Amino acid sequence: MENNIRLGKISAVDYAAGTVRVVYHEKDDAVTAPIPLISSEYFMPEVDDMVMVLHLSNGTEAGVVLGRPWSEKNKPPEGSKGLYRKELARSPGEAMIRYKDGTMTIKAAKLVIDGTVTVSGDVTAGGVSLDNHTHTDSMGGGTSGPS
């Protein structure tokens, strides 16, 4: 049962099958058979990413990738108590969901919502409040806010 949990590096990725091969440099560069990741989400690691693997036997044939530990290459993008942050792209902050202290932030280059959107509070876009904005009338004067 020695060395059933190991750190290794991804040597190959099969995106369609959702499996990877892991190389163990400290084990004479032994490479696993294709093994799956434990995840219900799809975000595959890349070649050379460090991963933690649970082996179900003494060999390298049966195992599962438990995840990517924080490392010099994979640092937390930020950290504080009560923070939830899910990165959705390889570069931190490029595409993510963040929640802290009652505020949720969704960030992406483009956001597509396929369905009806209902908002119960004010909507602000480009610094303009939908509830409290005014327009200039045809005579150059201001109008009252929306009613």
What are these regions (language model features)?
Residues 97-98, 103-129, 133-135:
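Low-complexity, small-hydrophobic/phenylalanine-enriched stretches
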Residues 1-94, 98-99, 143-147:
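Exposed beta-strand/loop interface patches that mediate assembly or binding
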Residues 3, 43, 58, 110, ...:
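Short, flexible coil/turn micro-motifs enriched in small/turn-prone residues
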